[in-house]
Amino acid sequence: MLIFIPILIFVALVIVGAGVKIVPQGYQWTVERFGRYTKTLQPGLSLVVPFMDRIGRKINMMEQVLDIPSQEVISKDNANVTIDAVCFIQVIDAPRAAYEVSNLELAIINLTMTNIRTVLGSMELDEMLSQRDSINSRLLRIVDEATNPWGIKVTRIEIRDVRPPAELISSMNAQMKAERTKRAYILEAEGIRQAEILKAEGEKQSQILKAEGERQSAFLQAEARERSAEAEARATKMVSEAIASGDIQAVNYFVAQKYTEALQQIGSSSNSKVVMMPLEASSLMGSIAGIAELVKDSANKRTQP
C-alpha cells in the first residue's frame, strides 16, 4: 500500500495542474470541451475540468498594429500610385474573433487592401495627395463596419505614403517650380506697383503742400501790397492836407523822404558803373521854394471870399 501513495500524489498533482490555468494580463483564452467552445478565461487564475476541457485559442486583447503591404492603385485620372498603409485593431469579443474567421489578421489585411483600392480608385491624384485625412476617415468607417461580426474594433487606419510614378513626380516638381516662380513674379510686380502708388501719393502730397505754400505766399504778398498801398494813400492824403493847410514842413519832409528812397533804389542797382550824385542843395531848396509858393497860392485862394 505504501508504494502506491507517491503514485497517487503524483496523479493528483497532474490532475490539479491540468485543471488550473493562469491567464496573463491582456489576453483571454477560450475553453473547448470535446472540441466545442464552452467559456472564456479572463486574466488571472482559472479552473477547468481536467482531461475534458482544453484551451482553444489564446486571444490578444490589446491594441495591435497591422502593417498593410504596399500596393498599386489606379486613380480616377489613370495615374498608377503606390499606397502604403497601417491598420490599428483591437479585439473586443474573444469568442467571435476565435471562431468567426479562420485567420483574423490575414482577413483584416485583405479587407483593408480591397477597400483602399476601392476608395482611392474613385479619386483623382490631387485628391489623394490633399485629402488624406478624409481618406483615413472613410476607410476607418468602412473597415470597422465590415469587421464587427468578427468581434474586432478598428481604431485607426492611416495612409502612410502615396507615391506617384517617378516621371509624374518630375512633372509635378517642374509644375511646382513654375508655380513658385509665377508667385515670385506676381509678388515682385505687386511690390513695384505698391511702390509706384506710394511714390505717386508722395508726389501728390508734395504738390499739394507746394501749392498751398504758394497760395499762402501770394496771399501774404497781396496783403503786404495792399497795406503798402493803403500807407501810400494815407501819406498822399496827408501831403494833400498839408498843402491845403499850408504846412511847408510836412511837404518838405515828404519830398525829402521820396528823394532819399529814390536814391537808395538807384544806389542798390547791380550796375556798379552807374554813379548817382545827389541834387545840389540850391536846386533842392529851389524845388522846395516852388512848392511853398504853390502852398501860399492855395491858402490865398481859400481866404478870398
UniProtKB/Swiss-Prot annotation:
CDD domains per the UniProt record, alphabetical: SPFH_paraslipin
Compartments reported by the entry: Cell inner membrane
Keywords: Cell inner membrane, Cell membrane, Membrane, Transmembrane, Transmembrane helix
Any one GO cellular component localisation term in the record: plasma membrane
An example Gene Ontology molecular-function term: identical protein binding
Annotated transmembrane regions: 3-23
PROSITE patterns: BAND_7 (PS01270)
Pfam families, A to Z: Band_7 (PF01145)
Sequence ranges on the Cytoplasmic membrane side: 24-305
Periplasmic compartment residues: 1-2
InterPro entries: Band7/mec-2_domain (IPR050710), Band_7 (IPR001107), Band_7/SPFH_dom_sf (IPR036013), Band_7/stomatin-like_CS (IPR018080), Stomatin_HflK_fam (IPR001972)
Mutant phenotype after disruption: No visible phenotype.
Protein's recorded name: Protein QmcA
Upper taxonomic lineage: Bacteria, Pseudomonadati, Pseudomonadota, Gammaproteobacteria, Enterobacterales
Gene: qmcA
